[in-house]
Amino acid sequence: MGWEKPIIDGIVPTLGEKNYPINTILCNSFGFGGNDSALLISLHSSDCDDCPHSNYTEKDIRVLSKVEIQSEDDLLEISKYIKPLEVRRMGKLMKSTMLSSLKALEMAGIDVPDAIITGTAWGCLENSEKLLEQICNEGECMLKPTYFMQSTHNTLSSCIAIRTHCHGYNITYSQGSNSLEWAIRDAKRLLINGVCKSVLVGCHDESTPTFRKLMERVGVYNLNSIHSIALVLSCGK
C-alpha cells in the first residue's frame, strides 16, 4: 500500500525489471510480539579475499566434549556455574540448558564458542503453558512480559550467548525429533567451510503433566521431564 509514493531516499519497490543484475536481497520476517528478523543475502565474486577458505572435511571435525542431562536430579550441579539467586528465577529447562552447555564448554576448555546452534522440538513448554493460562484467566490487558519472553524457542540459545558473551552465529532449529540432527549438520557446515573453529551444539526439551497427557492420547509415553544434550565441536588447530 502506498508504494507509488516512496519515502525520500528510501527503497523504491518495483514490479520487476528485466536484464537487471541482482547481487543483494533483503528478506524481512515480522512475527507476534516483536519477534522480527532480517536476512541479507549477497552474491560474492569468486575472487573475494574476505571469504573464508578451508580444505577441511567432515573427518577433520572433533567432538571435544559431550554432556547429557535426563532428570531434574542432575540439576543440582548448576550452583557451580550460576549464582543461586539467578537459578531461582530459571525454569527447569533453562537450568538444564545452561548447566549442560556451560559444563560442556568447561570440559572442552573453551570460554567463548565461535557459534551457538540449538535444537528444540517443543521449546519452553512450561512458560508457554503459564502464558496461555494467564491469558485465559486474566485476559490480554495486564500480562507479565516475562512468560512471553521466556516461552519462545530461541530463548535458550540467546541466554547461552548472553552468559558466554558470544556475539557470533546463533540460530535455533525446531525440527521435531530431528532438531539435533539439523543443528549438527549446520555446525559441520560452519566448521568445514572455515567460518568457525568451535561450535556449541545443543538440543533441549522438557515436558509438563499437561503435555504428557496430551501425548499419551496419540500413543507417546514415558517422556522425560527434561532432556538436554550439549556438544562442543571443533575443526582445525
Q: Language-model features: where?
A:
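Conserved "HGTGT" condensation-loop signature of ketosynthase/thiolase-family condensing enzymes
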Residues: M1-Y169, S174, E181, R189-C196, ...
